[in-house]
Amino acid sequence: STSRRQRQMCIRDSKMVEVRMILADCGYEIVSMKEAGIDIDIVEDGKTFEENAIIKATAISKTKEAEGCVVLADDSGLEVDYMDGAPGIYSARWQGEDTPYSIKNQMIIDALADAKEEERTARFVCAIAAAFPDGTVTTRRGVIEGMIAHQPAGEHGFGYDPIFFLPEYGKTTAELAPEDKNKISHRGRALEKIREVL
């Protein structure tokens, strides 16, 4: 039989609502870093979303508090084709971590001022790493394709959601209800794939 400790999953705090909704019936008790009492600084110096997710998951899994747990960590961001894939893996740090997303979003819109409609393509990418107690680590990637909107719209979501337009829905991801966004989001897609290995 599996001990309760082995059925715990430790996750970084920032996306807990979405994670708990999607992994609700996966058979694990889902615990955030904060709930587990884990407070460590992690240097994300990978060159890809996958590398950064692995760095985070591995660092957390080595803490005493995460011993015996499966650790999930993600790295995600926005890739804008007209900006050569920027902000990419630097999405959170782009233009400074303390710069409000309202300003970052406007900077992206401004950068695309001369872009033709077909040049406004972009995608949200999420890589999730699962670090297991035996030391193995696996990753899964989720992607959602869209366009950069001409102006921000919507009150839901966070970060770049107000400028990420989904043509098939006629809305930005910030205009979608959270439960609808979770069904199609890059993180949701990556989480659905990672479920298969849990």
Give the ranges of each region predicted by the language model:
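Single conserved hydrophobic/aromatic residue that forms the stacking wall/gate
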Residues: 1-7, 11
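Anionic-ligand binding patches
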Residues: 14-198
